[in-house]
Amino acid sequence: MTALRLLVSDSHDPLFNLAVEECIFRQMDPNQRVLFLWRNANTVVIGRAQNPWKECNTRRMEEDGVTLARRSSGGGAVFHDLSNSCFIFMAGKPGYDKSISTAIALDALKLLGVSAFASGRNDLLVATQDGDRKVSGSAYRETHDRGFHHGTLLLDADLSRLANYLNPDPKKLAAKGISSVRSRVANLCELLPGIEHQQVSHALIEAFFAHYGARVSPEHISPTQLPDLPGFADTFARQRSWEWNFGHAPAFTHQLDERFDWGGVELHFDVEKGVIGRAQIFSDSLDPAPLDALAQRLVGVAYRSDAIAALFGQLKADFPARQAELDALAGWLQAALR
């Protein structure tokens, strides 16, 4: 078995790539040093301990067809599209050292003609006339015998889209989760006009080989060309599941309010593991009975617009005289919780 392994994904599906990453990390020989390269189509990737409703504008993501994906490592929320290059270094202990992988990434940038440096928050920065700006962010994961360093390099990303999806709606979320630190970012194309993913990948590969003094042939991965990955189907199913991407969120509370022509409504949700544990509805409506019934039925329901919308069919059957009001309430909730 060679000491180095190079894998390149030909898929742009973020859920596929994260599942491959997880399988490789769990099954790699701890004596190997692995570099895995890929790109994702429109995606917001959140850290293992983050709350997607707090970090992301989930409504706009759904409208624009942007995928939400939770990774197994820590760190903050990032937006990926095909103008981002993703890399991951994996190694067994005691050889794993994130300062080594950081040095390889910096060497790759140097090969491209970019002088960058590492910051205290695990980012790679470049000095510009507008101050220091981030061109790469990183996240890390360690087990008892191995570790990995996951990073992205911004090539020509639409930074306005990044800001749109990572800035949540102006709703108050009193969360126990971790908020991302928003950083000033820069595209490499500002420094290297015309830079492409293939050039960045080549530089990362050359820096990886140079550091370890050896070369290996790349293994190309796609949904139709998988390496030997026992258990991949189960890992992929978990990575695609709502329970992992949304339900794994830390406990949080969410408050919503709206005024209708029949009265004002204020809702308080306590949510844990993506399920509503407690719901309170306050209103000056002249007939609060349907709202009381809704509050009771919300308990134990997944914090998803479709799951909550499904409650209204029976509510309208139980309160036929209030169908118009319940339709208005259902429409508002579906829009507010997307």
UniProtKB/Swiss-Prot annotation:
Residues given in the record as ATP binding sites: R71, G76, A77, V78, F79, K134
Domain BPL/LPL catalytic positions: 29-216
Statement: the UniProt record of this protein carries the keyword Lipid metabolism: no
Pfam hit, one: Lip_prot_lig_C
CDD domains linked: LplA
Annotated catalysed reactions: L-lysyl-[lipoyl-carrier protein] + (R)-lipoate + ATP = N(6)-[(R)-lipoyl]-L-lysyl-[lipoyl-carrier protein] + AMP + diphosphate + H(+)
Record localization: Cytoplasm
Pathway assignment: Protein modification; protein lipoylation via exogenous pathway; protein N(6)-(lipoyl)lysine from lipoate: step 1/2; Protein modification; protein lipoylation via exogenous pathway; protein N(6)-(lipoyl)lysine from lipoate: step 2/2
MF (Gene Ontology): ATP binding; lipoate-protein ligase activity; lipoyltransferase activity
NCBIfam families: lipoyltrans
Similarity comment: Belongs to the LplA family.
Assembly mode: Monomer.
Protein name as annotated: Lipoate-protein ligase A
Organism in which the protein naturally occurs: Aeromonas salmonicida (strain A449)
Phylogenetic placement of the source organism: Bacteria, Pseudomonadati, Pseudomonadota, Gammaproteobacteria, Aeromonadales
